[in-house]
């Protein structure tokens, strides 16, 4: 029985997994993303950045679990993810202010950007790491051009400050997405096809995850 552990506070990622029939334990990593990115240097590619961040989150949660006196389960699979939008030669995470989100949306309007999502898994067996793996998915997102009134109304909801790139596909921001090339679930924050591959390489089937992590 493998317990799935999601190393993320993202409600979007949790929702994707639950809609796919799995109810994971949520353990937030709390890693210092800015410090990790600063340590990567300018040569790091967008795919490298999100993969390293995802790995750091999964590793931090795995360390937390191995340090507990009472283990969550004999067998655990920790998943860490990180998403960032690449547009105009720069990586964009969560906007820090409404003004930042407004400028980002004005630069995205009527154009497309590339959403990079890093995925990392760490398997723990009897509190020992027995498997590590990570990979990045890339999805192209096409944006509409919202009117000034619509954009201001969207910014006023606060949703844009909670997500990478300042937009959602599965929320209010979905009104302003005209198309997606690639995996839609990766845009929400965790790509099911890539996650399935990583889980399989860890020696675990989706059927086994359904059985050991049932929805309430």
Curated annotation (Swiss-Prot):
Assigned EC number: 3.6.1.9
Catalytic function, reaction form: a ribonucleoside 5'-triphosphate + H2O = a ribonucleoside 5'-phosphate + diphosphate + H(+); a 2'-deoxyribonucleoside 5'-triphosphate + H2O = a 2'-deoxyribonucleoside 5'-phosphate + diphosphate + H(+)
Disulphide connectivity of cysteines: none
SUPFAM superfamilies: ITPase-like
Annotated active site: 82 (proton acceptor)
Biological processes annotated in GO: nucleotide metabolic process
Location within or outside the cell: Cytoplasm
GO cellular component, one term: cytoplasm
Catalytic EC class: hydrolase
Keywords: Cytoplasm, Hydrolase, Nucleotide metabolism
Cofactor: a divalent metal cation
GO molecular function: nucleoside triphosphate diphosphatase activity
Pfam families listed in its UniProt record: Maf
Purpose of the protein: Nucleoside triphosphate pyrophosphatase. May have a dual role in cell division arrest and in preventing the incorporation of modified nucleotides into cellular nucleic acids.
PANTHER family named among the record's database cross-references: BIFUNCTIONAL DTTP/UTP PYROPHOSPHATASE/METHYLTRANSFERASE PROTEIN-RELATED (PTHR43213), BIFUNCTIONAL DTTP_UTP PYROPHOSPHATASE_METHYLTRANSFERASE PROTEIN-RELATED (PTHR43213:SF5)
Protein family membership: Belongs to the Maf family.
Protein name as it appears in the record: Nucleoside triphosphate pyrophosphatase
Source organism phylogeny: Bacteria, Bacillati, Actinomycetota, Actinomycetes, Mycobacteriales
